[in-house]
Design a protein with these regions (language model features):
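Short linker/helix segments within small regulatory modules
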Residues: 45-57, 74-77
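Conserved beta-alpha-beta core of the PfkB/ribokinase-like small-molecule kinase fold
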Residues: 243-307, 311, 320
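Short functional micro-motifs and their immediate structural scaffolds
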Residues: 38-40, 68
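Short cysteine-rich clusters marking metal-coordination/redox-active sites
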Residues: 32-35, 60-63
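Glycine-rich phosphate/adenosyl-contacting loop at the front of the ribokinase-like
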Residues: 95-155, 163-169, 173
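Short metal-coordination and nucleic-acid-contact micro-motifs, chiefly zinc-binding Cys/His arrays
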Residues: 25-30, 53-57
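Conserved phosphate-binding/catalytic region of the ribokinase-like
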Residues: 95-101, 303-399
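Conserved N-terminal subdomain of the carbohydrate kinase-like
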Residues: 121-124, 147-244
Length: 399
């Protein structure tokens, strides 16, 4: 474990954050214990202040997270102090905070930016590839949770093509545990080409084209077979450990089997559907504790009324999100404004990862969480998502 040299500042940092408005105004130098940047208090502008549950707080001008403290609090504004506060406040130390297994959609995303030498209304254009790396909802969530300090275990059956091996290499580079990742001839790899374009009037638009290695225009995915592969996977997994979370985003039978078995062992199950239109979707919901979806994919939430033991989250883009906890009513949380929107792809994945991270930071088992616990978690998740959209690519500033 990391030596706690500056433990005497832990409570003081919390007080300084709580009294953020007064503390920062009286300070000469400020620091952010999230991104560990140091800057003069004069760099904090009126646009950096935002309301929170206790009044007004300042968003770091470097990373847009509300983890700013000033030297008027009595805390030395030094990088080593900020780094220790980060580990203490965000629960990240030498030991990972939790274990999460993820089954579902893993792609190799190619991100392309289209340039128009004669302007967006002209006919000429050139495409520039700016990134190529693992994507897909499950792929992104695993990488993001690893960045939050989790032990993450992707479960994915990839083929042995160069692209399939690239996905595996990227997962490993992000710090994921690779014991449940395979690259075999009978596996599946899906390629996604995401092109950022402009309409003739200059407004942005995105085109997405799927395919698979070898030139096919169709996705190719391989999931666990429910009759034999899923039971074998659960047996192997639980012989080593029982994960704290199981995340899945595809309602195939194999994933339903894994969710059912792990939930009986105490794992918190998180399902992210792209639609709620089949019996399989509803079965996945019944097997899960947390269900998150967008208003674009799932506008009708009436199905949630049939369940009284879950957290439902519907994201609504810039308008924020709605949530329903157990048998409570649907409630709305406003969005976190961001005028510098570059790319909204992946914002939902940041929301998901931050929700899981926030639940672990809270310290209570999911079944004991109440609305007072959930609201700050969802607000923080929206802040991560809002920050992400200022960056190109689904992983934001991690890319």
């Amino acid at each position: 474990m990391t030596e706690k040299k500056y433990e005497r500042y832990y409570a003081l940092a919390g007080k300084a954050s709580f009294e953020n408005w007064e503390s920062v105004k009286k300070s000469k130098m400020c620091g952010c214990y999230y991104c560990c940047s140091i800057f003069p208090s004069s760099e904090v502008t009126d646009d950096d202040w935002t309301p929170d549950l206790h009044g007004r707080t300042v968003l770091c001008p470097k990373c847009s997270i509300d983890s700013v403290i000033g030297d008027a609090s009595g805390i030395p504004i030094r990088k080593d102090v900020l780094e220790e506060l980060y580990r203490e406040k965000f629960g990240i130390d030498d030991e990972p905070v939790a274990r999460c297994v993820g089954s579902g959609i893993y792609n190799l995303d190619t991100i392309v930016v289209r340039d128009y030498p004669d302007g967006p209304a002209g006919k000429r254009f050139t495409d520039k590839v700016v990134a190529e790396e693992v994507g897909g909802t499950c792929g992104n969530v695993m990488c993001l949770l690893s960045n939050f300090g989790f032990e993450t275990y992707p479960q994915v059956c990839l083929d042995d093509s160069p692209q399939g091996k690239k996905i595996a290499a990227d997962l490993e580079n992000y710090g994921c545990d690779m014991r449940f990742v395979t690259n075999t001839p009978d596996g599946g790899t899906t390629l996604l080409r995401v092109t950022h374009k402009q309409n003739p009037d200059g407004s942005p638009k995105i085109s997405v084209r799927a395919g698979s290695p070898g030139g096919s225009r169709f996705p190719r995915r391989k999931f666990l077979r429910a009759r034999d592969q899923a039971p074998a996977f659960v047996e192997k997994l639980t012989s080593e450990f029982i994960p704290d979370f199981y995340f899945f985003d595809s309602p195939v039978a194999g994933h339903r089997y894994v969710a059912r078995e792990l939930r009986t062992m105490g794992t918190t199950v998180y399902f992210e559907p792209s639609s709620v239109s089949t019996k399989a979707d509803l079965e996945c919901i019944s097997l899960s504790d947390i269900i998150k979806f967008s208003d674009e994919n799932v506008p009708d939430t009436s199905f949630a009324d049939s369940f009284n033991n879950k957290l439902f989250v519907q994201t609504c883009g810039k308008d924020g999100l709605c949530f329903k906890l157990r048998d409570g009513e649907w409630k709305t949380l406003p969005g976190i404004p961001n005028d510098n929107i570059v790319d909204t792809e992946g914002a939902g994945d940041w929301t998901t990862a931050a929700i899981i991270w926030g639940i672990v930071r809270n310290g209570k088992p999911f079944v004991e969480l109440n609305e007072e616990d959930i609201v700050p978690i969802l607000i923080e998740a929206q802040r991560f998502a809002s920050e992400k959209v200022s960056y190109l690519g689904s992983k934001g500033n991690l890319l």
